[in-house]
Curated annotation (Swiss-Prot):
SUPFAM superfamilies: Clavaminate synthase-like (SSF51197). It comes from Drosophila melanogaster. Pfam families: JmjC, JmjN. Belongs to the JHDM3 histone demethylase family. The modification Phosphoserine is found at residue 409. Probable histone demethylase that specifically demethylates 'Lys-9' and 'Lys-36' residues of histone H3, thereby playing a central role in histone code. Demethylation of Lys residue generates formaldehyde and succinate. Its EC number is 1.14.11.66, 1.14.11.69. This is Probable lysine-specific demethylase 4A. Its cofactor is Fe(2+).
Length: 495
């Protein structure tokens, strides 16, 4: 027992610690360059870093008098927590009635929700975990907007100007809270559950005013350990969705993390301080009282490998999914073709030695060009016996074909948006019913040949244009129902 404890202590001593940086105003001028600098110092190894901005940086010159902040919270959420012994599930119930920021502050400072008396931050942390399931707090999360001045040019969270802007530039897509700013107004015990950022992106969080915020962070190198613990503890949730931690519902206490030898760090963010989370850095935390923060995501070239291999929740339609096509094409041109083919072999940055192919997009230019050439070749060759297609050609690789009978269906992640084609397919006899001349040198399995033909016809089904669906491939995992989009080939038996 002592040997195991000694080993755990030794490993904990090797865990990267959260670093705090105090840049000068000159060093603070270039956001992306400074992120590269703190990573050169190893800040990313802990998954979280704190930055204390220079005194010259004033994001809001008018201050934070609540009466001067014209802000309405459209749908605050009530956080209901269930569970015991350090393992909890947090359910966010959206309230129907909107609130002004002043009303929210008065609620936060009321006797029911005010911060309890405490000696220090450690004492307050103990009270948090002891009372986590009692008196559900309100949290004003994901509120569109910014508290920063529009003319703020340095570290303006609403426009950080990183490569994540390419999502808007190339796809003309704006994702609220990802490439725009979100505001968060908290009260005592309002929490953010264990999660990594959407697509394992970076994030920046600036605490504009109010009570502190406690953060927990797991170094990215140990992120899989947390996933394993969560998947075993909440196995039903995992069976429903193998990326269910992205639902941001799971709270696990530091005590339980220690029991399972999962290294973590803890830090308190004060008003006026910035927190940076790094790719695949799991983090969680809670607010000490009424406060206001501003946050968004950003990216760097180092993130691209994380993004290509990020887990994606497919059971919720509102989950953020970003095409990696523009990033691979621009910054990894030597790997682009292989990536499109699903042959971009490599490791997840936090799992060295575990080689696998990065998931390709479901639709891409390579597939289109290949199928265009195949379609052209078929047009030049005589039509094969028994098959004709009523409809347009298509640029799509085959997925799979099922039973060749009076009708067939094939699973696909992308449904066609055109008229359903009708395929006239002569029903082929089985090999047992086909007379075989004694001199025949070959045996033909006509059922197999029919499947091949249906696959070819499937390739020719009309599909959306490039850019309409560039999401990552992956298996939809659900024990209660399998969610697939299907296209139907209607087979007409002329025999």
């Amino acid at each position: 027992m002592s040997t195991r404890s000694s080993f755990a202590d030794e490993e904990q001593n090797k865990v990267p610690r959260i670093m705090t940086f105090r840049p000068s105003y000159e060093e603070f001028q270039n956001f992306s360059a400074y992120i590269e600098y703190i990573e050169s110092r190893g800040a990313h190894l802990a998954g979280l870093a704190k930055i204390q901005p220079p005194a010259e940086w004033v994001p809001r010159k008018s201050g934070y008098d609540i009466d001067n902040i014209n802000m309405t919270i459209p749908a605050p959420i009530c956080q209901v927590v269930t569970g015991a012994h350090g393992v909890y599930q947090q359910i966010n119930i959206q309230q129907r009635r909107q609130m002004t920021l002043r009303q929210f502050m008065e609620k936060a400072n009321s006797e029911l929700h005010q911060t309890p008396r405490h000696f220090d931050y450690d004492d307050l942390e103990r009270k948090y975990w002891k009372n986590i399931t009692y008196i559900s707090p309100l949290y004003a999360a994901d509120v569109k907007g910014s508290l920063s001045d529009e003319d703020l040019d340095v570290w303006n969270i609403g426009r950080l100007d990183t490569i994540l802007n390419l999502v808007n530039t190339d796809y003309n897509i704006i994702i609220d809270g990802v490439n725009t700013a979100y505001l968060y107004f908290g009260m005592w015990k309002s929490s953010f559950a264990w999660h990594t950022e959407d697509m394992d992106l970076y994030s920046i969080n600036y605490l504009h005013f109010g009570a502190p915020k406690t953060w927990y962070a797991i170094p990215p190198a140990y992120g899989r350990r947390l996933e394993k613990l969560a998947n075993e503890t909440f196995s039903e949730n995992y069976q429903e969705c193998n990326a269910y931690l992205r639902h941001k519902m799971t709270m696990i206490s530091p005590k339980v993390l220690r029991q399972h030898n999962i290294p973590y760090n803890k830090i308190t963010q004060e008003a006026g301080e910035i927190m940076i989370t790094f790719p695949f850095g799991y983090h969680a935390g809670f607010n000490h009282g009424f406060n206001g923060a501003e946050s968004t995501n950003f990216a760097s070239k180092r993130w691209i490998e994380y993004g290509k291999r990020a887990s994606i929740c497919r059971c919720r339609s509102d989950m953020v999914k970003i095409s990696m096509e523009t990033f691979v094409r621009r910054f990894q041109p030597e790997r682009y073709d292989n990536w499109l083919k699903g042959q971009d072999m490599g490791c997840h940055p936090e799992e060295p030695g575990k080689i696998c192919a990065a998931a390709p997009p479901t639709l891409n230019e390579y597939e289109k060009q290949e199928n265009l050439r195949a379609a052209k070749s078929e047009e030049e060759s005589p039509q094969k016996r028994g098959c004709s297609l009523a409809g347009n050609g298509c640029e799509r690789n085959a997925e799979s074909a099922e039973d060749v009978d009076d009708k067939a269906s094939v699973s696909s992640y992308s449904s066609c948006r055109q008229l359903q084609p009708v395929v006239k397919l002569r029903k082929l006899p089985t090999i047992a019913s086909v007379p075989e001349p004694s001199s025949a040198p070959k045996r033909y399995d006509f059922n197999t040949e029919a499947v091949v033909r249906v696959k070819r016809l499937w390739n020719e089904l009309p599909c959306p244009d490039r850019g309409a669906n560039l999401l990552t491939n992956g298996v939809v995992k659900n024990t209660k129902r399998m969610r697939f989009q299907t296209k139907v080939l209607t087979l007409d038996d002329e025999d």
